[in-house]
Structure formats: C-alpha cells, structure tokens
Amino acid sequence: MNEEFNKTLKSAETEDWLDLHVVRPFCYWWAVLFAKFDIHPNTVTIWSMIIGAAAAIFFGCGSWYYSGTWGLWMNIIAILLLCLADIFDCTDGQLARMTGKKSRLGRILYGVAGFVWFLPIYHALVYRFFLHHDIEFAWLGIENNETNTWIATLVAWALGWISGLAGLAAQQRLADYYIQVHLFFLKGEKGSEVDNSRQQQETYDKMTKDTPLVERVFQKSYIDYTKKQENKTPEFQRLMAKLREKYGSTDNIPQEFRDEFRRLSLPVIKWNGLLTFNFRSAWLFLFCLLDLPVLYFLWEIVGMGLLTWYVNHRHETFCRQLADKL
C-alpha cells in the first residue's frame, strides 16, 4: 500500500503528523472505494460541503451545560460530521491523483469547501449564544434581560463575521498558498497548483455564454481568491518576478535555488500546518464542548491571527533575502 498511498499525496512534507499517519491513510481507502464506483472527485467535494454545512444544525443545538446529555450528543454528532466532511475533502484530492480526474473546477471547489462548512456553522454558534449565554453574562456581570441579550448577540454576530472573513478565510487562503508554493519549488510547476490572478483572469475572459453559469461564478470568485493571496505575499511576488526576469521561465530555475528555497520553507511549513483544519477545529470543538462557542471567535481573531502573522512574516523575510541575492 505504501507506494500506492504515497502517489496519492501531494507531498509528505506538507502534511502534519495527524494527517499523514491517521487522516490520509483513512482517506486513501475511501478513494479506493470511490474509484471502484467511478465517482468523480468533484462529487466527493460537494458531498463534503453538504456534510460540513449540516454539522451547523447540531452545533447550534449542542449544549451540555444547558441541555444535559442530549446537548452533549448534539455536540458529538456535530464534531463527527465536520470530521467526516474534512475526510471527504482530503479524499477528493487523493482520488483525483489516483484516477487522473483533475479539473480547474475541482481546484476551485477545494478552495471554497471550508467556507461552505464554516459560514453556516458560525451563524449556528451565534444562534446558540442567543439561546444560551448565562455563563458569559455571569462572568461579565451583565444582567440577563432581553435588551442585553440582543445587544450581546449582535456583538457575537460581528465577531463571527470578523472571525470568518479576517480569520478563517484569510488564514486558510494563506496556508493553502504556502503549501502550493512549497510544492512548486519541491516538484516544479506540474507538481503544484500555484495559480496567479492574471492567468485566472485570462481563463475567465475565454469563457463564453455557453460556459455553465456555476463554473463562471466559481472562476470569478477564484480570481479574487488568488489576488488576495498575491496581495498578502508581496516579497514572494517580487522573488518570482526576479526569477522570471533572470531565467526567462520558472522551468529554468536551477535545482540549487529550488533546494535552498525548500530548506528555508520547510520550517515555516511546519508552523503553516497549524493554520489548517486539524489545529483550528480542535479549538472549535473544545470551546463548543465547554459551552463557550463565541470564545472561539476571539481565539481565531487573536490567537490564530498572531500565528498567521508569524508564518507570513517568516516566509516574506526569507523571500526578501533570496530576492535581494538575485
């Protein structure tokens, strides 16, 4: 199995320990099963979106402190559903590499899957806070009346939006980009999925009215996705521009330079792994089980925000140093 399993991975270097030793082997057997039934990777991604979004219903109802065993089971079901959604989200890529069924739409769906999960989940957590907030009000010394409940819920909703847009969306977008960048220097252009907004805009411009509306909408959103990745990494963009200027094509980048980039990138990738699903969701599960779901928003904004800044700072620093040497 090892050889066949390894072929379905992008690279062991970009997987954290839990993914490499637990999640990915499990996903491999799912991929084998789906391949036997000729199920397309994009179908698996869509299943992942539906399952992850469905977890929101149970997160919104789950509360051990307020609802006893029933609420605890709602939390557990929500956690299991979100974990299953992540397993399917990992399986789609392994299935695509196993069967060769890769597509531009698949790459775009992969990029938005997490947002489809967490958008309803975050709203469900705000609704849960609206129903159950005695602990937080007691801590803050707030009188538990209807007016204060609505005010606090609006604050929680605002925190949820900040957490989702400035937190989850921005953090996972950057984490995904750094994984693809590392793969680019490790395996070359064919071994990675580093996209740039200019090429994606050209792809969109070539679409006609006969192109399915869904595909055009996803492609348009993917242009914005890649632009935000580029805007967050100016030193890396400068490095790539200097490499193209010096070598004419990224295919001509010397192996010695690729090895040096990989050496500098590898320690950052280890930290970058904390921005992906496993570490992030562990905190979500913890705060929900503690019946303090809104505190997760604060953690994602502050704690995960500082971690994202650190990863971005380290990556941009060594990119600037490499660019200055060219």
Where are the model-predicted features located?
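Hydrophobic, membrane-inserted alpha-helices
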Residues: 30, 51-56, 120-124, 279-287
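Select subsegments of transmembrane alpha-helices in polytopic membrane proteins
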Residues: 41-49, 110-118, 269-278
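Structural signal for membrane-spanning alpha-helices in multi-pass inner-membrane proteins
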Residues: 56-63, 121-128, 288, 311, ...
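Transmembrane alpha-helical segments that form the membrane-embedded catalytic/substrate-channel core
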Residues: 83-90, 165-182, 305-317
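Alpha-helical transmembrane segments
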Residues: 126, 131, 143-182
